């Protein structure tokens, strides 16, 4: 079964996938390393060279996204709000052209998504998200953002409800990112639809954090 990519959200055609995606985004406030539906890279030993590379990424990112502190500028520049009407701890404003570019090359000034929190009068910029293609190796990821500095993650082991099932028919404790089903065998037994991985590899960065340990933290 074909996987779903960051650049192909379609809430009307695939509402189950949309709900799962929202659950995945919401799970960023949880301990993702403990989730059966999340894989995170292991931190590699620190090195001065990696710290220098990470600093260079931030030096390119900060001025590139400074204007997007006004979220309306981000919208005007082609960023689209993912699930704007669904309450979320963080809202992803995604630039699908940058997402496509990220499948082939890494440009620190072109994050796939901007991360905002909702405010009374709009949105406040918190950070950004870089992506890499699904099939990228950990060495590929390390070449972009050092694995000694940041932990990339991917969303895995997703079992969606049977196609056409209504919410009344679905046990939400079993399906989706918050569900207990985390193997293909169990998913097939439940009549669900199995996705070994959805979306690309991702890594969040919060360049305005004063605490260095929180800049690359989830």
Give short role names for the model-derived ranges:
Residues 1-27:
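Compositionally biased, proline/threonine/alanine/serine-rich low-complexity intrinsically disordered stretches
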Residues 17-114, 118-218:
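Primary mode marks residue(s) on the alpha4-beta5-alpha5 output face of response regulator receiver
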């Amino acid at each position: 079964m074909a996987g779903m990519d960051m650049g192909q959200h379609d809430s009307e055609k695939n509402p189950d996938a949309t709900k799962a995606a929202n659950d995945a985004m919401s799970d960023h406030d949880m301990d993702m390393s403990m989730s059966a539906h999340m894989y995170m890279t292991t931190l590699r030993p620190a090195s001065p060279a990696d710290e220098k590379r990470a600093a260079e990424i931030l030096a390119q990112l900060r001025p590139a996204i400074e204007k997007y502190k006004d979220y309306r500028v981000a919208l005007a520049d082609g960023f689209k709000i993912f699930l704007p009407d669904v309450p979320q701890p963080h809202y992803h404003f995604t630039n699908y052209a940058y997402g496509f570019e990220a499948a082939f090359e890494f440009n620190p000034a072109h994050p796939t998504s901007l991360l905002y929190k909702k405010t009374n009068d709009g949105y406040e910029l918190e950070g950004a998200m870089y992506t890499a293609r699904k099939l990228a190796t950990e060495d590929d990821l390390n070449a972009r953002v050092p694995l000694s500095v940041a932990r990339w993650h991917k969303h895995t082991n997703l079992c969606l409800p049977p196609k056409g099932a209504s919410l009344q028919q679905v046990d939400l404790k079993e399906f989706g990112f918050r569900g207990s089903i985390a193997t293909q065998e169990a998913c097939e037994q439940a009549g669900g639809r199995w996705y070994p991985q959805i979306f690309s590899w991702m890594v969040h960065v919060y360049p305005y954090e004063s605490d260095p340990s929180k800049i690359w933290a989830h």
